[in-house]
């Protein structure tokens, strides 16, 4: 079984090319493969397939709204084996892999997800590096919320970016204090407000067009980056300045991305790196199915 390994601003993924969607992916297998000691190690798995194949194989019960049968489909699984609606960094890496592998030759195409279609523009791609913009769709503010992160109680704004986020901006937080915060520790939030869990971002106030962010992703813990989280952070940061639209650089531990919030949509531009490819032992893979 072949695989590729890549990352978008150090949010890393194992890609499993499975265009016909024939591969069985149990939660136990996903968790084992993502384990950094007994598997390959990753924040998540990206199955590379098409929307119609995913429906035919029962991976999807039906096409997500706006996704066409012939679209590529990113079947994204969190490191704990759960299924996730969307991952902005994952879409960039997914699109890069399609180009680098020769499965796709266009500069502009659509990647389907549980959250709907995500049009991509590949500005540059070679076998290792790519620069990709993802149309993330409209990010919707849902109201205020609170979280406790690293023992610090924070107020935030709930944002729907195809998956749930709570972006917590602390105007008194410096980049140095943010770097020292224990974002990897379990976070507390209102489960009545977020019954399926939530991704929690902690961010500084914007300065000179830059906002610094760290994220605790549901089902994963702290990651070096979160694409949908950077969009949520940009929405919250702009709102703190009394703006509904604008462009910000979001600085995460894994690097910088550019987020453009418009009246109609949100655009995420950033890098992708393909690190390795190889084969997974079929015997090992079978042993992980439980």
From Swiss-Prot:
Its main location: cytoplasm. Disulfide bonds: none annotated. It is found in: Cytoplasm. Coiled coil: none annotated. The keyword Hydrolase does not apply. GO terms for molecular function: diaminopimelate epimerase activity. The record marks 165, 217 as: Could be important to modulate the pK values of the two catalytic cysteine residues. Keywords: Amino-acid biosynthesis, Cytoplasm, Isomerase, Lysine biosynthesis. Pfam families: DAP_epimerase. The active site is at 87 (proton donor), 226 (proton acceptor). GO terms for cellular component: cytosol. Its EC number is 5.1.1.7. Pathway: Amino-acid biosynthesis; L-lysine biosynthesis via DAP pathway; DL-2,6-diaminopimelate from LL-2,6-diaminopimelate: step 1/1. It comes from the Bacteria. It catalyses: (2S,6S)-2,6-diaminopimelate = meso-2,6-diaminopimelate. PROSITE patterns: DAP_EPIMERASE. Substrate binds at residues 11, 78, 88-89, 163, 199, 217-218, 227-228. GO terms for biological process: lysine biosynthetic process via diaminopimelate. Catalyzes the stereoinversion of LL-2,6-diaminopimelate (L,L-DAP) to meso-diaminopimelate (meso-DAP), a precursor of L-lysine and an essential component of the bacterial peptidoglycan. Belongs to the diaminopimelate epimerase family. Homodimer. PANTHER family: DIAMINOPIMELATE EPIMERASE, DIAMINOPIMELATE EPIMERASE, CHLOROPLASTIC. This is Diaminopimelate epimerase.
């Amino acid at each position: 079984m072949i695989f590729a390994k890549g990352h978008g601003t150090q949010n890393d993924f194992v890609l499993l090319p499975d265009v016909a969607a024939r591969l069985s992916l149990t939660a136990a297998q996903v968790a084992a493969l993502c384990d950094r000691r007994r598997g390959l190690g990753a924040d998540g798995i990206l199955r590379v397939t098409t929307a119609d194949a995913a429906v035919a194989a029962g991976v999807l019960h039906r096409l997500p709204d706006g996704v066409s049968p012939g679209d590529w489909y990113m079947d994204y699984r969190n490191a704990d084996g759960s299924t996730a609606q969307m991952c902005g960094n994952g879409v960039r890496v997914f699109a890069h892999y399609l180009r680098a592998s020769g499965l796709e030759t266009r500069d502009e195409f659509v990647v389907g997800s549980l959250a709907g279609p995500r049009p991509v523009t590949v500005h540059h791609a070679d076998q290792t590096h790519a620069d990709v913009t993802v149309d993330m769709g409209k990010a919707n503010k849902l109201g205020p919320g609170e979280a406790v992160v690293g023992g610090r109680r924070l107020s935030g704004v709930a944002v729907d970016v195809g998956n749930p986020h709570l972006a917590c901006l602390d105007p008194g937080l410096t980049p140095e204090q943010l770097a020292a915060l224990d974002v990897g520790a379990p976070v507390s939030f209102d489960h009545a407000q977020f019954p399926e869990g939530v991704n929690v971002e902690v961010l500084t106030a914007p300065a000179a067009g830059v906002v610094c962010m760290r994220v605790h992703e549901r089902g994963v813990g702290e990651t070096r980056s979160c694409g949908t989280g950077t969009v949520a952070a940009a929405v919250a940061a702009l709102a703190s300045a009394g703006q509904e639209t604008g462009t910000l650089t979001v600085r995460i531990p894994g690097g910088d991305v550019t987020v453009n919030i418009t009246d109609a949509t949100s655009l995420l531009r950033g890098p992708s790196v393909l690190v390795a490819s190889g084969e997974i032992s079929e015997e090992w893979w079978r042993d992980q199915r439980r």
